[in-house]
Amino acid sequence: MKSLILAEKPSVARDIAEAMNIKGKRNGYIENEKYVVTWALGHLVTNAQPEHYDKAYKEWKLEDLPIIPKRMQTVVIGKTSKQFKTVKSLILDKKVKEVIIATDAGREGELVARLILDKVHNKKPIKRLWISSVTKKAIQEGFKKLKDGREFQHLYEAALARSEADWIVGINATRALTTKYDAQLSLGRVQTPTIQLVNARQQEINHFKAKKYYTLSTEIGGLTFQLSTNKQHMTMEDATQIANEIKHVEGNVDSVEKKVKKSHPKPLYNLTDLQQEAYQRYKMGPKETLNTIQNLYERHKVLTYPRTDSNYLTDDMVDTIKERLYALLATDYKSQVKSLLGQSYSSKMRIFKNHKVSDHHAIIPTEVRPDMQSLSNRESKIYMMVAERFLESLMAPHEYEAVRVNVTVGQHIFAFNEKVTRQLGYKALKMNNDNVVKKVAFQKGEKYHLQSLKVNEHETTPPDYFNEGSLLKAMENPQNYIQLKEKKHANTLRQTGGIGTVATRADIIEKLFNLNAIESRDGKIKVTSKGKQILDLAPQELTSPLLTAEWEEKLLLIEKGRYNSRHFIDEMKAFTQSIVNTIKNSEQKYKHDNLTTTECPTCGKFMIKVKTKNGQMLVCQDPTCKTKKNVQRKTNARCPNCKKKMTLFGRGKDAVYRCVCGHTETQEQMDKRFKNKSSGKVSKKEMKKYMNNEDSLENNPFKDALKNLKL
């Protein structure tokens, strides 16, 4: 009898097979005398679409809503059905005695496996592999500590409840809004509050009025002292009056305080922190950063599991510190690593906190030594960020002397503050000792004449627009960016982790860009006209982050077995009915801001101009009519003069390629040039690949609404 191991992806299945010495490669699985390893391809099973319950639902009609199945059904995803059949046959094989779930250790990974097992009506015992890295050692250790699958039943119930609730609310809200206003609109309990976050910041900036304020400074003993005052902002009159009062008054050194203080390194990275800093340093978008970390985790095996919200490690990881340090000998920090290898480590260190680790610990290096030459530029940057933060966390605190000198001048106090480094500690890693200062040699009781008095003018500044990094942080802590009526609501958001999860926030932002609900100009994220209208048209409950916080609060209770998942679904059904009724009864209007005078060749309605990943496209405004045609798009065809990518205008034989340098080619000229480049022979497939013919809509909500619908 054999154990069947179900991984989430082929790459992870191969890693498990290698670690467990399973070498018999077959079509869709790998086996030996003890184990059979197979894999999903992400989700193989998903929630059925509305037309599965009733063919009439294929046509979107407002009067059909809400669509709430009595019992949710699942279907096998068509494009991966072949692999599903393989997995099904293996699960039902009489030679298989048990199933070991080896999908990602988290809510979504549990759902991937359990939907498959439920679909094939599995009756065999289930065990769970729960690991945070896919290195050989981690896999082997994980198999020594397999958990009983029943321990994760509540996790599965929470995952299933989240999936079904998103389907019920998302399908109905999107169909209601789309059919009510005859426009391609999308609503969701995660998307819409994110638009609201961006809008709130935008409104704050728009309504901001700059105010001037003043400070007073003086030179004493060659150093600049600032007036200490209880007023947040002084007026020009206040500052000038004080300056006139004391300009001939002698200053007396009232106190010289010197305190030794310590600063500790920043916490280890969780995913959001890493995404935010990668954007600040390298302008890498959240999705790009996540994909890069995923590569370092799965392919190179040099980083631990990326989708984590924790900044800490568990006590049992103390003994793994040195093997991780050995791996970092391959980096430019070899000398610092050698020094750290000579130290001992304890679970009393600040980085070890069991109670602050839920599913996965912070992102840190694994024991696998990286081949830095084989890493891409992005991979190298991200790996070194994680390595640096890990090394800093193991080094001594930065120790400095905080010096404060108070000089009394009449009834006023002027202060000088400085930090003098005593021990670099963790800051030695980057040698950023920026604390070189003039020697402070004041003594209490000394008298000084003021060398100058200066009134300094300042101006208040508005908050910054969100960028892709700061928006992630705002989604994690929305209570810091929006006004809430009750304090308990802020606590709920804080405790549940805000809008979305570390695993979904990057996708949410990308989806909103694609929906044309938000846009980024010069790194500043703003709400589009369409996004503002969505907020105006949407029921208020869907624009507040409180909804997703309340959901998450209950989902966490379901995970812990303290709340019934069916009660949660019943609440979502009632909520959906309310949302649909609100939209049906609304008297508001939607106005297309991108409507053209071009008539749709299919139905005759005016078409709208939309952005795509590589250009622009005309799409029929009627959501039931799928007519579309290219206006322009970027291609992979290079200009023969300046080598930049050319833009395609039109289609077929009349197509024209233009470059920003002014060079223009017809389709015929392009075909001829391409044939010459390929020795007179080129296939349609090669041409299509070369042209990167991408015609998917960036702001088409139907693609998301009709597929996974993770709103």
From Swiss-Prot:
The keyword Cell cycle does not apply. SMART domains: TOP1Ac (SM00437), TOP1Bc (SM00436), TOPRIM (SM00493). It comes from Staphylococcus haemolyticus (strain JCSC1435). CDD domains: TOP1Ac, TOPRIM_TopoIA_TopoIII. Its cofactor is Mg(2+). The active site is at residue 305. Residues 152-580 form the Topo IA-type catalytic domain. Residues 672-699 are annotated as: Disordered. Residues 2-135 form the Toprim domain. This is DNA topoisomerase 3. The gene is topB. Belongs to the type IA topoisomerase family. Releases the supercoiling and torsional tension of DNA, which is introduced during the DNA replication and transcription, by transiently cleaving and rejoining one strand of the DNA duplex. Introduces a single-strand break via transesterification at a target site in duplex DNA. The scissile phosphodiester is attacked by the catalytic tyrosine of the enzyme, resulting in the formation of a DNA-(5'-phosphotyrosyl)-enzyme intermediate and the expulsion of a 3'-OH DNA strand. The free DNA strand then undergoes passage around the unbroken strand, thus removing DNA supercoils. The keyword Iron does not apply. GO terms for molecular function: DNA binding; DNA topoisomerase type I (single strand cut, ATP-independent) activity; magnesium ion binding. It comes from the Bacteria. Signal peptide: none annotated. Keywords: DNA-binding, Isomerase, Magnesium, Metal-binding, Topoisomerase. Residues 186-191 are annotated as: Interaction with DNA. Disulfide bonds: none annotated. Its EC number is 5.6.2.1. GO terms for cellular component: cytoplasmic replication fork.
